[in-house]
């Protein structure tokens, strides 16, 4: 047998430095198929450019770290397929990526030692002739390394068998020949997890699908290691509110791995989203249509002995399909019971931290007073004026800390007279806020009186209860306006004689 050169010895040394398998089981999204989830595997030492010799390989940061006994978590690189972990017996293999024809090495090209891949992958290959290994060691200096890696990364059994056949290596064991297996994340055994669509008070919300009925759902996840887990409390409140108009239904709740999971009815965009869509300005008709439904949702929560404590446009969503005109209320992560089963009201307390969203919080909440029904109602009033005005006077205040910003908002809110806040808008809005601020801590709001303020205004304006909101007509208005402008540019006005 011929003696190996120094470069060949260096290449063999490189094999020894990279032969230790890495722990690679971190999930990631496959860039070639965004809807699929794959498992990253294999060392970054394989991701070397074409023409890399021993010197370039030894300069690779991961190889240098491995030489010193360090291990790094691999990362998915753009446009690189992924290497599945070793396939155990009776284990369904992960999704494989098809190799391109250009990735098949030519039989006459020198190839890298397949034992490197054997060591990295954990596959049990049949014994290889030592003479063949020695001969292949010389080929490690060739520029065909990237070609081998390009093929090996795909791990397509048919193509890999073709490659090994060019080296007179026994074919791939039959258990590795298989069809593609779809990879996906599921919760509750029947809900497929998709992309992230939002965030709540204590968790992220993802789009999901019931694989049995094809119904799309919303999936809320919360880490079980959260300092103050709230999702199980929120799911219980949804069940307490079950049956109310504008209350989303729960499909499933439980724990999956390190996450608490709640699967619920999928809803449409939030009022904040629609407000932005309409250039941050709602017409009076839309505000009154929304106010009527939003008041009813809050009243229903109160009649079930709870207060919401986080009233804001983001927590009111429109329905989908036939319920597209129905306003829903969501996110009970901060909700609190204000009276017990005997209708005993909670005690009045002070020096409470602010709970909720400062922009819409009541004045008493800013003052540290325990919240009750009056505070939810007052917060609604600020939301209505936000829709009318586009902004509130206490928005955009700058401060170094969050506490300082809350203090600035509180000072500005207290110093702003209701008449000034509602100047230029129908008197019903000022009457609404003045009534809310006059309520006692345990006093029950007169929801009917408040609704009639806006219904009377609605009829006085001769609006129609057709449930046509601004966002229903905004798109068509823009399209017609654009068409008219294009027509005027194409057909200029001509002087008449």
Curated annotation (Swiss-Prot):
SUPFAM superfamilies: Protein kinase-like (PK-like) (SSF56112). The lineage of its organism: Eukaryota, Metazoa, Ecdysozoa, Nematoda, Chromadorea. It catalyses: L-seryl-[protein] + ATP = O-phospho-L-seryl-[protein] + ADP + H(+); L-threonyl-[protein] + ATP = O-phospho-L-threonyl-[protein] + ADP + H(+). It comes from the Eukaryota. The active site is at 310 (proton acceptor). Residues 88-105 have a biased composition (Low complexity). One of its GO terms (biological process) is regulation of locomotion. Its main location: cytoplasm. One of its GO terms (cellular component) is cytoplasm. Residues 14-34 have a biased composition (Polar residues). The keyword Cytoplasm applies. Keywords: ATP-binding, Biological rhythms, Cell junction, Centromere, Chromosome, Cytoplasm, Developmental protein, Kinase, Nucleotide-binding, Nucleus, Phosphoprotein, Serine/threonine-protein kinase, Transferase. InterPro entries: CK1_Ser-Thr_kinase (IPR050235), Kinase-like_dom_sf (IPR011009), Prot_kinase_dom (IPR000719), Protein_kinase_ATP_BS (IPR017441), Ser/Thr_kinase_AS (IPR008271). This is Casein kinase I isoform delta. Residues 1-58, 86-109 are annotated as: Disordered. ATP binds at residues 197-205, 220. It holds the Pfam family Pkinase. GO terms for molecular function: ATP binding; protein serine kinase activity; protein serine/threonine kinase activity. Residues 191-458 form the Protein kinase domain. Monomer. Expressed throughout larval development and into the adult stage in both hypodermal seam cells and the hermaphrodite specific neuron. It is found in: Cytoplasm; Nucleus; Chromosome, Centromere; Cell junction, Adherens junction. Disruption phenotype: RNAi-mediated knockdown results in precocious seam cell fusion and the early exit of seam cell from the cell cycle during the L4 larval stage. RNAi-mediated knockdown does not impair alae formation. RNAi-mediated knockdown results in a squat body statue, referred to as a dumpy phenotype, and rescues the incomplete alae formation defect in the lin-42 (n1089) mutant. RNAi-mediated knockdown increases the survival rate and partially restores alae formation of let-7 n2853 mutants at 20 dgrees Celsius.
């Amino acid at each position: 047998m011929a003696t190996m050169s120094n470069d060949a010895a260096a290449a063999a040394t490189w094999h020894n430095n990279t032969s230790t398998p890495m722990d690679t089981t971190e999930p990631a999204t496959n860039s070639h198929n965004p809807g699929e989830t794959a498992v990253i595997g294999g060392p970054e030492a394989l991701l070397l450019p074409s023409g890399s010799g021993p010197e370039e390989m030894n300069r690779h940061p991961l190889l240098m770290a491995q030489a010193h006994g360090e291990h790094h978590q691999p990362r998915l690189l753009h446009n690189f397929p992924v290497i599945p972990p070793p396939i155990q017996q009776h284990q369904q293999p992960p999704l494989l990526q098809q190799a391109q024809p250009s990735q098949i090495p030519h039989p006459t090209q020198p190839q890298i030692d397949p034992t490197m891949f054997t060591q990295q992958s954990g596959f049990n290959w049949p014994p290889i002739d030592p003479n063949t290994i020695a001969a292949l060691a010389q080929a490690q200096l060739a520029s065909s390394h990237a070609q081998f890696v390009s093929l090996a990364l795909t791990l397509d059994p048919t193509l890999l068998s073709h490659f090994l056949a060019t080296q007179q290596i026994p074919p791939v064991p039959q258990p590795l020949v298989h069809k593609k297996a779809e990879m996906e994340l599921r919760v509750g055994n029947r809900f497929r997890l998709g992309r992230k669509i939002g965030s709540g008070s204590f968790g992220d919300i993802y789009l999901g699908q019931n694989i049995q009925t094809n119904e799309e759902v919303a999936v809320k996840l919360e880490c079980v290691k959260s300092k103050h887990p709230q999702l199980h409390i929120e799911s219980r409140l949804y069940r307490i509110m079950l049956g109310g108009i504008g209350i989303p239904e729960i499909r499933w709740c439980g724990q999956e791995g390190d996450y608490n999971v709640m699967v619920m009815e999928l809803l449409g965009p939030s009022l904040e989203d629609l407000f932005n869509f309409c250039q941050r300005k709602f017409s009076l008709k839309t505000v009154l249509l929304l106010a009527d439904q939003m008041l009813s949702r809050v009243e229903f929560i109160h009649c079930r002995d709870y207060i919401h404590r986080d009233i804001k446009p983001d927590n009111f969503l429109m329905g989908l399909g036939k319920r597209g005109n129905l306003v829903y209320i969501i996110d009970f992560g901060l909700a609190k019971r204000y009276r017990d089963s005997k209708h005993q009201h909670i005690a009045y307390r002070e020096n409470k931290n602010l709970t909720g969203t400062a922009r819409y919080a009541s004045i008493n909440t800013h003052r540290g007073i325990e919240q009750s029904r009056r505070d939810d109602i007052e917060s609604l009033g600020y939301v209505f004026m936000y829709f009318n005005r586009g902004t509130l006077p206490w928005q955009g205040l700058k401060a170094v800390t969050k506490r300082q910003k809350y203090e600035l908002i509180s000072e500005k809110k207290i110093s702003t007279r209701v008449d000034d806040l509602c100047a230029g808008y129908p008197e019903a809005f000022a009457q609404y806020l003045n009534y809310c601020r006059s309520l006692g801590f345990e006093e029950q709001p007169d929801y009917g009186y408040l609704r009639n303020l806006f219904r009377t205004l609605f009829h006085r304006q001769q609006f129609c209860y057709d449930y046509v909101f601004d966002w229903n007509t905004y798109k068509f208005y823009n399209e017609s306006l654009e068409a008219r402008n294009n027509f005027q540019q194409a057909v200029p006005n001509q002087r008449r004689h």
